[in-house]
Amino acid sequence: MHHFFLPTPLSEEALAAPLTFSRKDWQHLFVLRLREGEEFVLADGYGREHICRVTDVQKNSLTASVVESRDSARELDCQLILLQGLPKRDKLELIIQKAVELGASSIVPVMMARSNVRLDDKKADRKAERLAEIAKSAAEQSKRGILPQVASPKRFADAIALAKDADIK
């Protein structure tokens, strides 16, 4: 069954009504050529999954109704936070993809003293957005119920402070 994340969680009232998806915003639903009666999963990113059944397909819209809502059973019992030094080139993208697939709940890129990669604030924000998209895609592919957070790159001292504040059991 196909798995997607909602941009924002829906209220119980919104879930009771038929959901309409526009081609402009949900192109990937149309690419799959879903037909009436087929089902897919919408996750809210906070641990709830909604199984939806397609009720109507038009040229520029798709309508579905929620058949069942449940808690996601695919998450780890603990939170796994990855503090990752910035590697060369695009290796960080692969690292984030695999970390999300393995169950990481949060990923913090760290600028180390000997890292060859240096990012200013503008580049760091763009890089964080790109990495968040990769994390979302990996979470959809591995059918996660929670959308992992990818922080903007931090300095080593800030990452250590973040680790000290973590709830370690």
Where are these regions (language model features)?
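RNA substrate-binding interface of SAM-dependent RNA methyltransferases
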Residues: 73-169
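N-terminal positively charged helical leader segments and presequences
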Residues: 1-71, 122
